[in-house]
Amino acid sequence: MSTYNKVKGSKFETDVMKFLRSLGHFAERLAKAGSSDEGDIVTIIAGQTYILECKNRKKLDLPAFWAEAVKEAANYAKARGQVVAPPAFVVVKRRNASIADAWVVQPLSEWINNIERDINANTNGRDQHDGDLGTKAGGA
């Protein structure tokens, strides 16, 4: 990878980190460690840790980007003695668009698993809702 591309990628990572921070979320860039990379950014949103792999490239190779994100999330967990890796996402820069309009990519099955995990975590000990938009289970 050329120096120009490294600078471009590094700037995108920094922009993503700053955007997350501007919304009040913890976000840090992670150090590069070759085959032991742990992702580009770790962020904590609503108490959940996420690993972000940021890509600022003209040519998209989503399967390769996703494989890298999963591997690096596993490296992150392993380095901290965690059994389960945090959810990983690929953040892809959109041409001629703001950082807020970057694409966030994850396979559908992973996304569903994350949604179900978050719902289960957020409904333990709280009022649960039925499928009727905002109506509490057991009556209105």
Predicted regions and their residues:
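Catalytic phosphate/metal-binding cores of nucleic-acid and nucleotide-processing enzymes, i.e., regions
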Residues: M1-A140
